[in-house]
Amino acid sequence: MPVITLPDGSQRHYDHPVSPMDVALDIGPGLAKATIAGRVNGELVDASDLIENDATLAIITAKDEEGLEIIRHSCAHLLGHAIKQLWPHTKMAIGPVVDNGFYYDVDLDRTLTQEDVEALEKRMHELAEKNYDVIKKKVSWHDARETFVKRGETYKVAILDENIAHDDKPGLYHHEEYVDMCRGPHVPNMRFCHHFKLMKTAGAYWRGDSNNKMLQRIYGTAWADKKALNAYLQRLEEAAKRDHRKIGKQLDLYHMQEEAPGMVFWHNDGWTIFRELEVFVRSKLKEYQYQEVKGPFMMGRVLWEKTGHWDNYKDAMFTTSSENREYCIKPMNCPGHVQIFNQGLKSYRDLPLRMAEFGSCHRNEPSGALHGLMRVRGFTQDDAHIFCTEEQIRDEVNACIRMVYDMYSTFGFEKIVVKLSTRPDKRIGSDEMWDRAEADLAVALEENNIPFEYQLGEGAFYGPKIEFTLYDCLDRAWQCGTVQLDFSLPSRLSASYVGEDNERKVPVMIHRAILGSMERFIGILTEEFAGFFPTWLAPVQVVVMNITDSQSEYVNELTQKLQNAGIRVKADLRNEKIGFKIREHTLRRVPYMLVCGDKEVEAGKVAVRTRRGKDLGSLDVNDVIEKLQQEIRSRSLQQLEE
């Protein structure tokens, strides 16, 4: 009979099989009331599943990450329950958990309107408030199939026929009269599923195949309590205000159009931000001793066949042909950098060789996945490749890590999650080589006092990697930086150097990206700063305004002086009220507005206002210029007097 070992090491002995709920009740009624599921010997199970042998058990509640995921999954079933009550002929497809919520794909003979979604959410609340028990039954494959055939659930029957073995025992979850099929676990009672909201609908092909029927996908979010739900909805509201597509249009930064899907038309102000970002990256390349190179954006298919990209990546590559030769527009820069490395004989004394490029890359992303600057087809990578010996890996990775944190801190990103991906089952190279490579990456992180987690088996076949994911002000994750070891590509492309022993050796290649796609990073910054770019990045840093025509000459002189000082400045001499001008440039997020009236002209000063509405008073022109230059030069995130 089972001996149950709890997380604190204590044990409970039973003379009969028990469920996680039984054990929770044994511990106390409070825990039993909070119990959502159990983790038995490391595996999630339903609260009602019986434990027959000795086992470790952790009780899962809404405070656990797994508990929240189970709540979300059960809310998908709740959605199914509600939609079948409102529209009984609906056929249910799949309803998985996604980030922050869930969705369900349904086959319905009507297009859901906003009113329909509201009615559906209302019915879900009515059902959840009944606090009914969710009953799980393990049945044979044949019984499960018969159940769904009788109910006309053709998609569930297809899942059974195509994805579930005949000797398996599927779990059927009964929500009163509604039955769904799932591996589980699910909540034992609907009292856990009160805090949700349906968000939107979209089209989705069955099994993601455009040859199949288009279904309707209903998205929802669910949380453990009302406070968490409201906080999430507030974050979404704030995110909508910060949407880089909306701000990009408002500030006239860029546009996209149907004739070039996923390609950016940069306007003057947006391109100014892009170039300033390039200047910043170049300054860091110089500081960390990189060469900057430029490779062709298109190379022959033969080269991509050698690298292995053609076999594994051709669907994402744009191709063209000329004079009976096929060419590929590059999706990445690395093969071109190896070609540059291969020019001329290299010695161990030439290593490490650090090569960087603002590479113009193109990938044939599905049109439905394109999203403003965040997901494009044409983009600029800020990546670099370091050619080094095995002995130099640790020092080079160390320098890459320092560079990553150095650059991210400039933009105020402080929360960075780091993951180390280790060897997959299918890989090249010896175990000894992988042992050393993984150890080098881990030690480099440890030497920089950076906490990290392992992603076992998630490395590429050609080497382990470090991933850097930064979190923005809304706590959204953006995976940008990568340090990837590569033991394959240099060999495939015949890269070599002469070692100390006078023998030819293959260099290790380190792929290093920090911002990733420049376009995407500008999108991230636009949302992070809500368009209030720090002064050094702002397209227009200062606007000088007159109150009446009598100050026009002074405004022009001051504008020229600011330009000569290297400040991006515009003069606004329009015959408009000063309040109108200030409001307009505030909406354009211009960091500083310098107002010139008769008093300022007479005193040789200028009245300074910030875009946040702060009046800094009347200041000496030279002092203002000096302070602005210092703010810009230091790439400060703070404005004057903040």
From Swiss-Prot:
It catalyses: tRNA(Thr) + L-threonine + ATP = L-threonyl-tRNA(Thr) + AMP + diphosphate + H(+). Zn(2+) binds at C334, H385, H511. SMART domains: tRNA_SAD (SM00863). The keyword Metal-binding applies. One of its GO terms (biological process) is threonyl-tRNA aminoacylation. Residues 243-534 are annotated as: Catalytic. It is an enzyme of class 6 (ligase). Binds 1 zinc ion per subunit. Keywords: Aminoacyl-tRNA synthetase, ATP-binding, Cytoplasm, Ligase, Metal-binding, Nucleotide-binding, Protein biosynthesis, RNA-binding, tRNA-binding, Zinc. Pfam families: HGTP_anticodon, TGS, tRNA-synt_2b, tRNA_SAD. It is found in: Cytoplasm. GO terms for molecular function: ATP binding; metal ion binding; threonine-tRNA ligase activity; tRNA binding. This is Threonine--tRNA ligase. It comes from Salmonella gallinarum (strain 287/91 / NCTC 13346). The gene is thrS.
